[in-house]
Amino acid sequence: MTLDKLIEKLAAKFRIVITKVAVKDHLAYKIEPHFLLPFLKALKESEELRFTVLTDLFGVDFPKKEKRFEVVYNLLSLKLNKNLIIKTHISEKESIPSAMQILSAAYWYELEVYDMYGVNFNGNNDKRRILTDYDFEGHPLRKDFPLTGYTQVKYDKKLEKVTYEPVNLDIEYREFDFSSHWHSPSYVLPGDEKTEE
């Protein structure tokens, strides 16, 4: 039996609804958040599959979608030497169940996804900022986060400490016009003959 058939059989056994999605060179499934933990547990404990290693967990922001955040789990079966991708989607106000009780590696990944996107994981109450500064405002990988941020960090020599100030730009935003004012030569350089039509 092929790997995708084994996974679909396992999902059916536990009445878990999964949808196969196209991801180049990988087997991937989309799942609703409430099915996530039972599915991860079944994949880990299945004697045939043994997806015991969480190699990555990350977020993706699609601000125009109703379920804005996609949370992606990359699993590895050492028994089969195969990878599996599990995707789930949540809106900005929803939270997702923490996978750290099933896959302990999820702990740090969940902190990172919270820090970068603001996605809350039920069961992981640690809200430390591990990639941004302690007083950082917002979540920098959201597509609506301003390029300049909200505050700038400076070392104040008089106070002898780091201070946070609102962003103050000395110049206006520049519009980058990539059209060149330089003109190409009217003759063809050796090797460029193929570009001529």
UniProtKB/Swiss-Prot annotation:
Tell me the GO molecular function terms. Answer: NADH dehydrogenase (ubiquinone) activity; NADH:ubiquinone reductase (non-electrogenic) activity; quinone binding
The residue range of the signal peptide is none
What keyword terms does UniProt attach to this protein?
Cell inner membrane, Cell membrane, Membrane, NAD, Quinone, Translocase, Transport, Ubiquinone
Q: How does it assemble?
A: NDH-1 is composed of 14 different subunits. Subunits NuoB, C, D, E, F, and G constitute the peripheral sector of the complex.
| Sections of the chain in a coiled coil | none
Report the InterPro entries cross-referenced here: NADH_DH_suC (IPR010218), NADH_quin_OxRdtase_su_C/D-like (IPR037232), NADH_UbQ_OxRdtase_30kDa_su (IPR001268)
Q: What is the lineage of its organism?
A: Bacteria, Pseudomonadati, Pseudomonadota, Alphaproteobacteria, Rickettsiales
Q: Output this protein's name.
A: NADH-quinone oxidoreductase subunit C
Family statement drawn from the similarity comment of this UniProt entry: Belongs to the complex I 30 kDa subunit family.
Query: Which Gene3D superfamilies does this UniProt record tie to the protein?
Result: NADH:ubiquinone oxidoreductase, 30kDa subunit (3.30.460.80)
State its Enzyme Commission number(s).
Answer: 7.1.1.-
**Gene name linked to the record:** nuoC
How does the entry describe its membrane topology?
Answer: Peripheral membrane protein
Its GO CC terms?
Answer: plasma membrane
**Top-level EC class:** translocase
Reaction(s) catalysed (UniProt annotation): a quinone + NADH + 5 H(+)(in) = a quinol + NAD(+) + 4 H(+)(out)
- Annotated function: NDH-1 shuttles electrons from NADH, via FMN and iron-sulfur (Fe-S) centers, to quinones in the respiratory chain. The immediate electron acceptor for the enzyme in this species is believed to be ubiquinone. Couples the redox reaction to proton translocation (for every two electrons transferred, four hydrogen ions are translocated across the cytoplasmic membrane), and thus conserves the redox energy in a proton gradient.
- Primary place of residence? membrane
Name where it's found.
Answer: Cell inner membrane
Query: Could you tell me which Pfam families the record lists for this protein?
Result: Complex1_30kDa
